[in-house]
Amino acid sequence: MNQRLVYVVSDSGGETAELVVRAAASQFYNSHIQLKRVPYVEDKTMLAEVVALAKMNQAIIAFTLVVPEMRQFLIEEAAREGVVAYDIIGPLIEKMSDLFKLTPRYEPGQVRVLDEDYFKKIEAIEFAVKYDDGRDPRGILRADIVLIGVSRTSKTPLSQYLAHKRLKVANVPIVPEVEPPEQLFKVPPEKCFGLKISPEKLLSIRRERLKSLGLNDQAIYANMDRIKEELAYFDGIVKKIGCDVIDVTNKAVEETANIIMKKRRL
């Protein structure tokens, strides 16, 4: 077999099927399994074409088709052509229907239905992008949470993680040469969190960052005296605000986010 190929077929976007297939493929070390997504399948002609391609390429078909007629056609067509076709969602729908005495809607794309919760998440993500890295201080007073810290303390990834929890987050870099925006000192202290890190850890992170950019890792940005100066300035700012400080030295973003949400009781 020249290639290991899986056609991911769906009558919706195919994200669900692809996630399952990728999870399965991850169990095979250095397998180099290739996925080809075939989304929004609406007719049997397209299904027949996929079966023909799968036969020609000795591939597997993994599919999420919720319409029974389409699902049955693919199963029968694949069997007729000797192609392996795996139904990801059909058997589970049937088991749920039988056990819970429920009637399925058989409507594609229900996972992607745009509801209020979805819009809140999108709004929070857009907010985090717009008010990232102190770009626009007007967002500080509109935010649910404000993060402050020196460079490379995971402010941006933490903002994005919290945004996926539907929280509007603004973050502000603390730099000795730049006076923090006045809005920062008007934020209720309980909404603001300072991100603290050990000088040694920060030095290591910054040097790796410079190397990844192809720059000299001995630049002032990765100088211990400079780092200590920045952290001392940061300490003064958080004391002035009166906000909580979280040591992120050895914490994953998820762990820091959980601490913040617990403190805010979110």
From Swiss-Prot:
MF terms (GO), sorted A to Z: ADP binding; ATP binding; phosphotransferase activity, phosphate group as acceptor; protein serine/threonine kinase activity
Pfam families recorded: Kinase-PPPase
Catalysed transformations (reactions): N(tele)-phospho-L-histidyl/L-threonyl-[pyruvate, phosphate dikinase] + ADP = N(tele)-phospho-L-histidyl/O-phospho-L-threonyl-[pyruvate, phosphate dikinase] + AMP + H(+); N(tele)-phospho-L-histidyl/O-phospho-L-threonyl-[pyruvate, phosphate dikinase] + phosphate + H(+) = N(tele)-phospho-L-histidyl/L-threonyl-[pyruvate, phosphate dikinase] + diphosphate
Protein biosynthesis among keywords: no
InterPro entries, A to Z: Kinase-pyrophosphorylase (IPR005177), PPDK_reg (IPR026565)
Residues where ADP binds: G149, V150, S151, R152, T153, S154, K155, T156
EC number: 2.7.11.32, 2.7.4.27
Enzyme class: transferase
Keywords, comma-separated and alphabetical: Kinase, Nucleotide-binding, Serine/threonine-protein kinase, Transferase
Protein family membership: Belongs to the pyruvate, phosphate/water dikinase regulatory protein family. PDRP subfamily.
Function according to Swiss-Prot or TrEMBL: Bifunctional serine/threonine kinase and phosphorylase involved in the regulation of the pyruvate, phosphate dikinase (PPDK) by catalyzing its phosphorylation/dephosphorylation.
Annotated protein name in UniProt: Putative pyruvate, phosphate dikinase regulatory protein
Naturally occurring in which organism (per UniProt): Geobacillus sp. (strain WCH70)
